[in-house]
């Protein structure tokens, strides 16, 4: 099994990732909630273990669970966001990422819907007014 996991890039050492965070490095991790290949629950459990192992340095990590998103991209949910820009702002300016925006584009490049990309443990909650297809109609809150 371990050899098979290595072949798909799923081999990992959670203690090594925690040490990476303890060295002051930053980590943004995400998973599509509808990912059929990588279990969002397993990914979240691994992330929680890393944060626990890292102690106070666990604040150097963020996890985003993308509603309706499949493996990396695709699925019914908005699947595009700027994690690279968020990481650059965090590393270069010290601005830790919070709520981001996920956007779905049609084949012509037009935005068709958006949702907030909420840092765990928060999730998108509809405010009760506005378009259900617009991130502005949601807030990030704990379930």
List the model feature ranges, each with a label.
Residues 1-143:
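C-terminal His-loop and adjacent cap/lid subdomain of alpha/beta-hydrolase
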């Amino acid at each position: 099994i371990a050899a098979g996991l290595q072949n798909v890039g799923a081999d990992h050492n959670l203690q090594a990732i925690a040490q990476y965070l303890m060295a002051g490095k930053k980590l943004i991790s995400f998973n599509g909630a509808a990912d059929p290949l990588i279990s969002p629950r397993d990914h979240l459990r691994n992330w929680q273990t890393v944060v626990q192992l890292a102690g106070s340095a666990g604040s150097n990590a963020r996890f985003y669970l993308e509603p309706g998103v499949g493996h990396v991209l695709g699925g019914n949910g908005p699947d595009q966001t700027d994690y690279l820009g968020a990481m650059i702002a965090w590393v270069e300016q010290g601005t830790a990422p919070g709520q981001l925006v996920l956007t779905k584009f049609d084949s012509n490049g037009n935005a068709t819907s958006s949702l907030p990309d909420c840092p765990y443990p928060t999730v998108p909650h509809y405010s009760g007014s506005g378009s259900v297809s617009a991130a502005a109609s949601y807030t990030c809150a704990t379930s």
